[in-house]
């Protein structure tokens, strides 16, 4: 494996009931351009994401150290692989969860994509792996902020990500979880 780990190193975290889901995503551009649908900047809270996008485009990424967003052009039949926050935690920042976003469609246009999110069991806690010295020198640690604390226990990280992605639903139906989340991660 590229990290100089045994091929089965991460198996223990996925054994039993790994947490995965697929998502069929259909974006619609309003005919008059007033109701813009896209996805704001975020990182995926899982381990890896595989994404197949149509030929419309609109996906952008901001690689580590970049000062601007770059287009991720569709390539026929190619999958986009996004590193998730749990892989960043496991590699102590050697591999970084890439921030990405989806721009709104042109008025009257549509965009379709299929995403597969692969993650450990909800109760799995990932410890940082021991990297070879050459890699370890390039591992700055996880890139967290007060608004996005990365948890080593996947279930905690998934809940944090869900609350972040669906703030209106969380505020309406799970306000108690928002209070707990803000209390445990230091953000407000």
Regions found by a protein language model. Give the residues of each.
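C-terminal flanking tails of non-heme Fe-dependent oxygenases
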Residues: 1-188
């Amino acid at each position: 494996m590229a990290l100089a780990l045994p091929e089965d190193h991460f198996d223990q975290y996925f054994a039993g009931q790994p947490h995965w889901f697929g998502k069929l995503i259909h974006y619609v551009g309003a005919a008059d351009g007033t109701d813009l649908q896209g996805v704001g900047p975020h990182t995926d809270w899982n381990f890896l994401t595989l994404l197949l996008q149509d030929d419309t485009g609109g996906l952008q990424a901001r690689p580590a150290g970049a000062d601007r967003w770059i287009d991720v052009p569709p390539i026929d039949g190619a999958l986009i692989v996004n590193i998730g926050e749990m892989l960043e935690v496991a590699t102590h920042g050697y591999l970084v969860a890439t921030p990405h976003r989806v721009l709104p469609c042109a008025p009257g246009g549509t965009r379709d994509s299929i995403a597969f999110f692969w993650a450990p069991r909800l109760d799995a806690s990932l410890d940082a792996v021991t990297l070879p010295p050459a890699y370890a020198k390039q591992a700055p640690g996880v890139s967290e902020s007060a608004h996005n604390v990365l948890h080593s226990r996947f279930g905690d990280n998934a809940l944090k990500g869900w609350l972040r992605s669906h703030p209106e639903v969380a505020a309406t139906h799970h306000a108690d979880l928002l209070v707990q989340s803000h209390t445990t991660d230091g953000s407000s």
